[in-house]
Amino acid sequence: MSRALLTLVQWLSPAFPTGAFAYSHGLEWAIAEGEVQDAAGVEQWVADILRFGSGRTDAILLAHALKGHDLEALSDLARALAPSAERLRETEEQGAAFAATTAALTGRALPPRPLPVAIGQAAAALGRPVTEVLELTLHAFAANLVSAAVRFVPLGQTEGQAILSSLHPLIEEIARESAEAPIEAIGSAAVRGDLAAMRHETQQVRIFKT
């Protein structure tokens, strides 16, 4: 394994201080309301977010950031695509934390940006294949949602790992498609996920920020 790949794995690990564990992407509301009740429901919910929601959207944004496209324009687009105040907060807060930590580690000037653009601006210097960066980023995103479900449904740890394993083919597929997708291909149809994120904003009892 190359040092660049090890660095990327470090940046996308749960130990990296982005605070990802505090965000459920609206999943907490879906669980609390009974829309997601078991392992099968969690797997379907996360798969839909990856395929039809912010998973694919962020992957395309990340791919363009990795290729050195206009980072300011990509950041503006990422903010505009956030379907709720909490989703915007989620991508901006994690992106700022990611940029600050990678800047401290690398000595580079890395301004705060929405998360997929922040990852792209930092990871571009590693020289890793675009598809590989997308796969690892999507995996980290899916793993965080599964971890939230393990804590809140609750599920067993083995059930959670089985869900994540079952999502690997989908992650590979989305990464391949997104690596070459034009920016015009961005679009979302994860309506239930977006509504869950909106409704979480007024959820009175919560353990996650989003």
From Swiss-Prot:
Subcellular location, record wording: Cytoplasm
Gene3D superfamilies: Urease accessory protein UreF
GO molecular function, one term: nickel cation binding
Predominant location category: cytoplasm
Keywords: Chaperone, Cytoplasm, Nickel insertion
Subunit structure: UreD, UreF and UreG form a complex that acts as a GTP-hydrolysis-dependent molecular chaperone, activating the urease apoprotein by helping to assemble the nickel containing metallocenter of UreC. The UreE protein probably delivers the nickel.
Family statement: Belongs to the UreF family.
Name recorded for this polypeptide: Urease accessory protein UreF
Lineage summary: Bacteria, Pseudomonadati, Pseudomonadota, Alphaproteobacteria, Rhodobacterales
